[in-house]
């Protein structure tokens, strides 16, 4: 029997070295018809990039700075001395507007008034009477227009990060969501429908109902959905120590809102400042009433409101002033009532969506055991059921945990519920 070729190779003690022809043959493996041209172009690109970096003076460093040999500290210092900081002034009057010889009266605070001209970088159409401007310190020429001065506490009310709450997270409020979307989203997405009919879209919504029914939650969902600027104001923030401070904050708030393309202003717990006017003989609530009157004026006063939607939430609508509630200021009143059986079942499913629960839990049965309960009560039931599971050192929540939680929260905490008191007043 003849030995196999593989056995011959294994048995060779002195393998034959590769000659030049074999090496040349190995180098041709994996090469295509354009390999030589591609290598040539790649080499030219590397050389060109190296030449560009040498001309620009950029080293391969973390900072990307030019080498010290190319630094020109004298010219940099001269440039810094020429660009002096500007001084803030206010343009009080324009003399001979819309002409080449237009002059501007500016008032520099704590110094004097000056009649000045425009700098080289400013267009005459950019300057209006009453606006803040930046002027140089030598000739007091107007160099740049400045935005209006707004209190930082008002600027901080803008919601920068969108909340993570969507309409799917608001259970038992199907009708309320539709009404809210008609007021907020429809005029922004389809304004042509209102133009064709010749009507103005509704601009204000009052959300009222018992505590814990989802008024603020729905406002957070609106902020998540819309691309407009969302400003959140808590009623007690506008109650200030000094006379006129609250009204000034309201004016600056709506001034900032008008500067946006589209804006939604949400007043939470509006009964803190929107109470009905009365005379208690002491005058303690006069400042709060002035703040409320400023809101009334901004909502529908002499000046147009613009594309500003106003949402208000309260659980005491009976205490609000009638001037605040009239159509034109708040066009719609949306009541957030207690959820029905279907709504309570949906709320249970929403809150248990992220929980480790058994599969065969009867949420409809749990909803039947929670009559006249709000969404906040049901959330408390789910949290308490998780506490029962933690206490028993289990990793999943059973139906018995939910039943025990219902017995504890719904029945045990009944005396703390604010819903019956709300029903009495409203």
UniProtKB/Swiss-Prot annotation:
One Gene Ontology term from the biological process aspect of the record: proteasome-mediated ubiquitin-dependent protein catabolic process
Predominant localisation class: cytoplasm
Binding site for ATP: 209-216
Keywords carried by this UniProt record: ATP-binding, Cytoplasm, Nucleotide-binding, Nucleus, Proteasome
GO molecular function: ATP binding; ATP hydrolysis activity; proteasome-activating activity
Superkingdom, taxonomy of origin: Eukaryota
SUPFAM superfamilies for this protein: P-loop containing nucleoside triphosphate hydrolases
Annotated compartments: Cytoplasm; Nucleus
Presence of the UniProt keyword Nucleotide-binding in the record: yes
Keyword Disulfide bond: no
GO cellular component: cytoplasm; nucleus; proteasome regulatory particle, base subcomplex
Function: The 26S proteasome is involved in the ATP-dependent degradation of ubiquitinated proteins. The regulatory (or ATPase) complex confers ATP dependency and substrate specificity to the 26S complex.
Family: Belongs to the AAA ATPase family.
Protein name: 26S proteasome regulatory subunit 7A
Species for this entry: Oryza sativa subsp. japonica (Rice)
Lineage of origin: Eukaryota, Viridiplantae, Streptophyta, Embryophyta, Tracheophyta
Primary gene name: RPT1A
């Amino acid at each position: 029997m003849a030995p196999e070729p593989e056995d011959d190779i294994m048995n060779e003690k002195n393998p034959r070295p590769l000659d030049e022809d074999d090496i040349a043959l190995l180098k041709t493996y994996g090469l295509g018809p354009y390999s030589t041209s591609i290598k040539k172009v790649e080499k030219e690109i590397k050389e060109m990039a190296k030449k560009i970096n040498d001309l620009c003076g950029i080293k391969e460093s973390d900072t990307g700075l030019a080498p010290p040999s190319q630094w020109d500290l004298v010219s940099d210092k001269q440039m810094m001395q020429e660009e002096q900081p500007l001084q803030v002034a206010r343009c009080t009057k324009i003399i001979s507007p819309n002409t080449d010889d237009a002059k501007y009266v500016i008032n520099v605070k704590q110094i004097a008034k000056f009649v000045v001209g425009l700098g080289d970088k400013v267009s005459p159409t950019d300057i209006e009477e009453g606006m803040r401007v930046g002027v140089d310190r030598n000739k007091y020429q107007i160099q740049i227009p400045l935005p209006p001065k707004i209190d930082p506490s008002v600027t901080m009310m803008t919601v920068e990060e969108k909340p993570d709450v969507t309409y799917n997270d608001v259970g038992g409020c199907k009708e309320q969501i539709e009404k809210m979307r008609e007021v907020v989203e429809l005029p922004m997405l389809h304004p042509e429908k209102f133009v064709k009919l010749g009507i103005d879209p509704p601009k204000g919504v009052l959300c009222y109902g018992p505590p814990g029914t989802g008024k603020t939650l729905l406002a957070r969902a609106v902020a998540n959905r819309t691309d407009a600027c969302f400003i959140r104001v808590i009623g007690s923030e506008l109650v200030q120590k000094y006379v006129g401070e609250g009204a000034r904050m309201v004016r600056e708030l709506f001034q900032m809102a008008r500067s946006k393309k589209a804006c939604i202003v949400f007043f939470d717990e509006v009964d803190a400042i929107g109470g009905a006017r009365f005379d208690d003989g002491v005058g303690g609530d006069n400042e709060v009433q002035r703040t409320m009157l400023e809101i009334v004026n901004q909502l529908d006063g002499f000046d147009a409101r613009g594309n500003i939607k106003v949402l208000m939430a309260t659980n005491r609508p009976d205490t609000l002033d009638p001037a605040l509630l009239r159509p034109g200021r708040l066009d719609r009143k949306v009541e957030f009532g207690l959820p029905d059986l279907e709504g309570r079942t949906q709320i249970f499913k929403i809150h248990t969506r992220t929980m480790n629960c058994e599969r065969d839990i009867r949420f409809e049965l749990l909803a039947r055991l929670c009559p006249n309960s709000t969404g906040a009560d049901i959330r408390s039931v789910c949290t308490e059921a998780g506490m029962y599971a933690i206490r028993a050192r289990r990793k999943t929540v059973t139906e018995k945990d939910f039943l025990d939680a219902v017995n504890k929260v719904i029945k045990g905490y009944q005396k703390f519920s604010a819903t019956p008191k709300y029903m009495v007043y409203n």
